Amino acid sequence: MQRLMKRKLAVIVILGSIVVLLAVRLASPSFEVGPEPFQIAREPNISPEYSGVVIPGNIAPMNFKILEEGQAYCARIHSADGPAIEVASRTGQIRIPLRKWRALIQTNKGRSLFVDVYVRNAENEWLQFQRIVNTIAKEDIDRTLVYRFMRPVYNAWKEMGIYQRDLTDFDVSLVMNGRSFGEGCLNCHSFAGDASETMTIGLRSPIYGSSTLLARKGEVHKIGAKWGYTAWHPSGRLAVYSINKVRQFFHAAGLEVRDVVDLDSALLCYHVEAKKVVSPEELADKNRLETYPTWSPDGLYLYFCSGPILWKDRNTVPPANYDKLKYDLCRISYDVETDQWGKAETVLSADETGSSIMLPRISPDGRFLLFCMCRYGCFPVYQPSSDLYLMDLATGKYHKLAINSRYSESWHSWSGNSRWIAFSSKRQGGSLTRTYLAYVDQTGQAYRPFVLPQKDPTYYDSLLETFSVPELIAGSVKVSKSVLARTARSEASVAVDIPITGATPKAGPSEPWLERE
């Protein structure tokens, strides 16, 4: 009896092994290209367009699909050292094994990465396309990208969340979802530099009201006021944030029919240990709109955007002259030891540029200031004219980056080593925001960007959600989503006295115009 059972077990094991081998064989086809394929004098059409780009040596596999008619497909990925990676496909989808990819790109930092593409046509002939050449940078990118993921906002939202993605692979985890606190809205996530230990998230809920979650030193507290765009002082002692009266409206026609106006705004300063909010006079001028704060890495200057209020009625939407409003780039000195502010000064004026200056962010080495400029207003993601510019802070000279498209480029952040930027772009058709990564060298030259790699190379083809506000951080968000949600629902909060009146009412799904996409 035992012998019979052993024989049956052996047969089952053998059959199981055969099934597994067949499955692997079917999933990973192998084709013999032949010694002399016909040469095609152009690069293959692939999606995403991972060609002529500079990539980090720690990025996830850059899977792609070959958009050429054929019966079979092969890709050979190789560099100066190490074994080549060969991937065969019946569909044109090239999914690169993670371990082999890591070994290849980490071994060849600073060198070229070659991709040879072969396609077998209906006549059973193999075609070889012109080689794709990319470059592996010597510098890695911060490991984690934190972003907001949601459908485009018109008149309502259903669901939104903040997620974090490990850029070295395809792992994605939820930081917090609006469903966890009464279908609320969450945005304006920010960090102290590229570290994940200090994080804030702005919340609005029809049930729980408006507040801000502050995660710091392993604890999470709820502050009884909603922060807008936030900038942490490098010391971690204080944060400057905006309060904004943002409203959305619509145009009858255009490449982008949505528009946003900030009817009133100011900058406030929150002192962490004292749990106190102050309003420096230079940052809350009643005749101007202050927004988008960012600190210099040494903490000596706060940079921000400031524009004149061109309307008397601060409730009408859209207000008079909304399309004539242009913001200047300003800065103000600060002494953290004495808590003393200097006088605000203009770094770059809208009169000089002819455009509205938005979203300043300084590289961690203090050398460059990355910012957006658009025709008017404060919301570049809704402005097709919005482009990225880079200022050399040593000289004050700035230039338009070559990586711009005909569509909107907007939210952006720096990697901790000042060599990489993540930014939002609508270049895939003008409607949906995607995250792109680009290398910036020591002279300020930016190289051709590439869209955030996905495990499925066709991922973006049918995706209707947007990736927004990409923040690069070195580590990862450790605080759990359950702790964040529980704190958001809690009645306990840190009470703060706001020295000036804000404009952030409770909001439900019918009021998306109070937020940013």
Regions from the language model: what does each represent?
Residues Q2-L15:
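N-terminal Sec-pathway targeting helices
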Residues I12-R25:
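Hydrophobic membrane-insertion alpha-helices, especially the h-region
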Residues L26-E517:
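Sequence signature of WD/YWTD-type beta-propeller architectures
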